[in-house]
Amino acid sequence: MIVNGIGALNLKPGLGDTATDLIQGGVAPATSGNLGTSFAEAVSQAASKTVNTLQNAEQVSLQALKGDADTRQVVDAVMSAQQALQTAVAIRDKVVSAYLEVSRMGI
């Protein structure tokens, strides 16, 4: 199963008016040579980014304990990690919910 990413839209630069861009042909369909990443790859990349964000927050916190980072850097890193973790949990909940819904379907 192939899921085309946002890059498959081939957006042309415009003045920022989406309706005008659409009317003038600013959005082109994906071509056969421009296949997006698979769903598994997209989920894997998102998980990797989340883990990297959490590790960065941990490193910045340790640097602050050593006196190498200020409070603002720690707060920014921890808030970013919290947001990434909340997003990952929300996605997990949606996937589990979808799985349960599909499993209840009759064949």
UniProtKB/Swiss-Prot annotation:
Keyword terms, alphabetized: Bacterial flagellum
GO terms of biological process kind: bacterial-type flagellum-dependent cell motility
One GO CC annotation: bacterial-type flagellum basal body
Statement: the UniProt record of this protein carries the keyword Protein transport: no
A GO MF term: cytoskeletal motor activity
Major site of localization recorded for this protein: other
Family: Belongs to the FliE family.
Name this protein carries in UniProt: Flagellar hook-basal body complex protein FliE
Organism from which the protein derives: Mesorhizobium japonicum (strain LMG 29417 / CECT 9101 / MAFF 303099)
